[in-house]
Amino acid sequence: MSQSKDLQGGKAFGLLKAQQEERLDGINKHFLDDPKYSSDEDLQSKLEAFKTKYMEFDLNGNGDIDIMSLKRMLEKLGVPKTHLELKKLIREVSSGSEETFSYSDFLRMMLGKRSAILRMILMYEEKNKEHQKPTGPPAKKAISELP
């Protein structure tokens, strides 16, 4: 088996993610230098947050999020969509292919006017993190607190 096809975990996966992060940082720099987005407040931190989310769902590191990665992301957020809805969403976002969208497409959507869908996705994910189950024994309740 060739080394380039061996994507097992560990060192090879770490190198793949490091290369992916370098590519995405280059795209972020392009967006930071673009005068169209210079008026956005706190653009640097937004781009870092978007990069982290994109890397989380681009598991194979090829630079594109496909329909199954998008499906997994929405299911994780508790907003499952049908295959046709996912295709429509990708078609709206993508500048080229109908089956995938790139990091540049993702950023244009997030920073542009048509960002409501993905902002909603990120908002649900943040709310999901806030409601973590408490650890330890449950708190004692008085009789008046019982239903």
From Swiss-Prot:
Cardiac allograft, spleen and testis. Expressed by inflammatory cells (macrophages and neutrophils). It is a peripheral membrane protein. Ca(2+) 2 binds at residues 98, 100, 105. Residues 45-80, 81-115 form the EF-hand domain. GO terms for cellular component: actin filament; cell projection; cytoplasm; cytosol; glial cell projection; lamellipodium; nucleus; perikaryon. Keywords: Acetylation, Actin-binding, Calcium, Cell membrane, Cell projection, Cytoplasm, Cytoskeleton, Membrane, Metal-binding, Phosphoprotein, Repeat. GO terms for biological process: actin crosslink formation; actin filament bundle assembly; actin filament polymerization; cellular response to hormone stimulus; cellular response to hydroperoxide; cellular response to lipopolysaccharide; cellular response to morphine; cellular response to oxidative stress. Residues 127-147 are annotated as: Disordered. It is found in: Cytoplasm, Cytoskeleton; Cell projection, Ruffle membrane; Cell projection, Phagocytic cup. The keyword Magnesium does not apply. The modification N6-acetyllysine is found at residue 11. Induction: By interferon gamma. It comes from the Eukaryota. The modification N-acetylserine is found at residue 2. GO terms for molecular function: actin filament binding; calcium ion binding. Actin-binding protein that enhances membrane ruffling and RAC activation. Enhances the actin-bundling activity of LCP1. Binds calcium. Plays a role in RAC signaling and in phagocytosis. May play an role in macrophage activation and function. Promotes the proliferation of vascular smooth muscle cells and of T-lymphocytes. Enhances lymphocyte migration. Plays a role in vascular inflammation. PANTHER family: ALLOGRAFT INFLAMMATORY FACTOR 1, ALLOGRAFT INFLAMMATORY FACTOR-1. Homodimer (Potential). Monomer. Interacts with LCP1. This is Allograft inflammatory factor 1.
